[in-house]
Amino acid sequence: MGQASSHSENDLFISHLKESLKVRRIRVRKKDLVSFFSFIFKTCPWFPQEGSIDSRVWGRVGDCLNDYYRVFGPETIPITTFNYYNLIRDVLTNQSDSPDIQRLCKEGHKILISHSRPPSRQAPVTITTSEKASSRPPSRAPSTCPSVAIDIGSHDTGQSSLYPNLATLTDPPIQSPHSRAHTPPQHLPLLANSKTLHNSGSQDDQLNPADQADLEEAAAQYNNPDWPQLTNTPALPPFRPPSYVSTAVPPVAVAAPVLHAPTSGVPGSPTAPNLPGVALAKPSGPIDETVSLLDGVKTLVTKLSDLALLPPAGVMAFPVTRSQGQVSSNTTGRASPHPDTHTIPEEEEADSGESDSEDDEEESSEPTEPTYTHSYKRLNLKTIEKIKTAVANYGPTAPFTVALVESLSERWLTPSDWFFLSRAALSGGDNILWKSEYEDISKQFAERTRVRPPPKDGPLKIPGASPYQNNDKQAQFPPGLLTQIQSAGLKAWKRLPQKGAATTSLAKIRQGPDESYSDFVSRLQETADRLFGSGESESSFVKHLAYENANPACQSAIRPFRQKELSTMSPLLWYCSAHAVGLAIGAALQNLAPAQLLEPRPAFAIIVTNPAIFQETAPKKIQPPTQLPTQPNAPQASLIKNLGPTTKCPRCKKGFHWASECRSRLDINGQPIIKQGNLNRGQPQGPTTGMNSGASQFTPQYRQPTPALPVINHAATSQTSGEQQRAVQDWTSVPPPTQY
């Protein structure tokens, strides 16, 4: 009987401690607390003898744990020992700070001390045969207090008891802590001062069998939760919640010692069926004190129970914990999906034995799986109409169309919504292509999801296969799975072919002669995104094609950067922003020598657009042109136009220039150059009459005066030239013209 009562008291104490820790949002298991206190009893055998748990006694327990840690090492102490010790110390410290709790605890402590007794080591006193016959077997009713218990000792002379008769009890002297350490350990805690109960030889304490039966029934009803309140309970001042208590405090029950129950003479004594396995020993104290003790303890329990408030179920989105509440079913516009099967569930430890039955019941009532909330809206026909118009005008893979689809996918579209959108907006061929791509990507996502345990029906949920083809079931998917569905739908949409463009390979995309380099790179990257995915537009293969498939002008401009490791293609676009700029840069780099590139330019220069205006006043000797090397991309027309004649001028024989452009007046020998032809010749005139009527005189053909000839040495001339010198012609007689 005693072991069953002790077991129930331990369970009640552990449950109260769990409730106290739950107020501070700390959840512990019952078996962990049991193992913790088992280790405490092993380390501190004096701890059960104290009879109560307060900050002073708990501090001594901490000192013992520290000594045990220093002597035996950390491997002999469980990991969670000091954690539980600190939590219980905080509970005791915070409760001692509240004046109301202190007042209530002081009143209850006075009641318990006044009706308790100190431990005794004296031998039990023998009793007479009549007393033995009238007594019942010793037993203890189950108590709700794990720290204080009073049991009536056995009257059997042949058997020793831990609790001797009250007649032999005396007040033990107060022992010091040093002397207490050498005393043998006691098994159950007891309280001091038993003078009020010490009445060994009085016959007034003996009860008749009828009163004893009523007393047993009343004491057995103490632990009954249906026991009504007593009418003569003393009133206590109202209790104010302490400052450290949160907004919701769970019910806290206070344990009381098992003492003597009232007799049948007490008015208002309740009657209830006896509990199994519970019996009371023969009372040895006054009836009035027993009744008053029970009234005071019941009042204390009632006052503390009235302070209990059930905590509201708080709902937290992230992080997901075991204490998260369920979402209310009356929430409108919300979907409460099933837990994500792609996440690793929490492994629950199996509890075995009677000590874990209560813990399993409490954990079964709490949600062990996280609850997700997300907003789901059905597709709007106006939005589908916009996407259909964009697909018809620009194509399914146009930037504007893809932007509309991406904005629509933020509404957590289900697989049924994606299939409906593809069937309504795309053409027949594009719809089939999208479905095949979506199923392929869904299988890839299901294979990449490597979790333990494997996801339940993961390959069936993403494509919306049976039994998840219903849209209502798909709306209950967790956000993680809906995100994978969104990614698969967008990726399959971007792989559709462009509008009006034949499907070609990536290597056949080349830059046109008049196409800008940026447009060529844009076409190349769009095709790479459609074929390989969004992450392959900046790959090394695409960069290689951007150089090899460019036109010759852009290749010459970006050739110095070919061997460099470029993270992006921005430097290539800077040097080839347009085809004309790239051609000019390539031509300039080919025609200029390295020495000319490094030659410093003058600070001031005169730019002459027409150098022919200076040739009359300052003729310049023109050197024959040198043979220039032919370049493949050099402008040959401009070079041929600037080249002069390869022979000297036939008119002046001084330089290499054309005769039509010669401006010299003297030839190489110093002789004046006579202009040939009638460039400056005027109209012919008629003859004039003079004194000689038979002669006609005509005006000379040249209006300009004949220049004075220099004096020439005819002898020298004749020697050098065998030709005879011509004389100056005078007037000439000619016949008159036939007509005027």
UniProtKB/Swiss-Prot annotation:
The sequence motif named PTAP/PSAP motif is recorded at 396-399
UniProt site (Cleavage): 163-164, 318-319, 648-649
Q: Basic and acidic residues compositional bias: what residue ranges?
A: 446-459
Compositional bias annotation for Acidic residues: 346-366
Annotated GO MF terms:
nucleic acid binding; structural constituent of virion; zinc ion binding
Q: Keywords, A to Z?
A: Capsid protein, Host-virus interaction, Lipoprotein, Myristate, Phosphoprotein, Repeat, Viral budding, Viral budding via the host ESCRT complexes, Viral matrix protein, Viral nucleoprotein, Viral release from host cell, Virion
Compositional bias segments (type: Polar residues): 117-132, 193-206, 323-334, 677-704, 715-732
Lipid-modified sites (N-myristoyl glycine): 2
Q: Which GO terms describe its cellular component?
A: viral nucleocapsid
Quote the InterPro entries the UniProt record gives: B_retro_matrix (IPR003322), B_retro_matrix_sf (IPR038124), Gag_p24_C (IPR045345), Primate_lentivir_Gag_pol-like (IPR050195), Retrov_capsid_C (IPR008916), Retrov_capsid_N (IPR008919), Retrovr_matrix (IPR010999), Znf_CCHC_sf (IPR036875)
- Show the segment(s) annotated as Disordered: 115-208, 323-376, 446-469, 673-740
Keyword flag Repeat: yes
Q: Name one GO biological process term.
A: viral translational frameshifting
Stated role: Matrix protein p10: Matrix protein. Nucleocapsid protein p14: Nucleocapsid protein.
Q: What is this protein called?
A: Gag polyprotein
The opening ranks of the lineage are: Viruses, Riboviria, Pararnavirae, Artverviricota, Revtraviricetes
